[in-house]
């Protein structure tokens, strides 16, 4: 159960990071709002359900330590600590089972992609030049990548600006259709 709790804790931390924002985080996904908002930042959606799972994970990991210490307390063929071991195991199983159900119904089922942010990340990524390399050549790719880093302009914008590809040709190399 400890291993499951550690993995679930990591997954929930990833959800929290992917949903961070609204302006200074990754903001790639939107979590369902479970509260009116953040007490210190109006309009922000706190990741309360992933945080609940984090807390459950910490409790399960603590219960695992209790089981380990209880096992260590055995003397010869007798372990008087079995009741607390059983209680910790049953509690952990109940916490995980209820937590998974809560996470699925109140969080996972309601997650949406923040398509605008994800699209912007892809189109503004310097890594896009790697996909263009076979089309525009290494020299042009290097030139565009360096200029994009120096100026903050997008790769597609610079390819058009330098007349390396036409807008129509560039659309065929894009991960998704673009209007601009």
Identify the function of each model-found stretch:
Residues 129-145:
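C-terminal accessory/binding modules appended to enzymatic or scaffolding proteins
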Residues 143-171:
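Charged substrate- and nucleic-acid-binding regions of tRNA-handling and nucleotidyl-transfer enzymes
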Residues 59-122:
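Long, amphipathic alpha-helical stalk/connector segments used for oligomerization, subunit docking
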């Amino acid at each position: 159960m400890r291993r499951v709790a550690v993995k679930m804790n990591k997954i929930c931390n990833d959800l929290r990071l992917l949903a961070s924002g609204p302006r200074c985080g990754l903001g790639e996904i939107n979590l369902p709002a479970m509260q009116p908002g953040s007490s210190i930042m109006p309009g922000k959606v706190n990741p309360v359900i992933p945080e609940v799972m984090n807390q459950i994970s910490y409790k399960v990991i603590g219960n695992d330590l209790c089981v380990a210490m209880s096992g260590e307390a055995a003397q010869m063929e007798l372990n008087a600590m079995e009741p607390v071991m059983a209680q910790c195991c049953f509690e952990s199983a109940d916490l995980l089972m209820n937590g998974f159900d809560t996470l699925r119904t109140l969080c996972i089922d309601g997650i949406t992609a923040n398509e605008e942010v994800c699209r912007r990340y892809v189109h503004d990524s310097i890594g896009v030049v790697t996909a263009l390399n076979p089309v525009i050549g290494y020299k042009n790719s290097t030139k565009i990548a360096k200029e994009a880093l120096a100026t903050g302009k997008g790769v597609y914008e610079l390819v058009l600006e330098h007349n390396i590809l036409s807008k129509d040709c560039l659309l065929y190399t894009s991960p998704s259709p673009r209007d601009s």
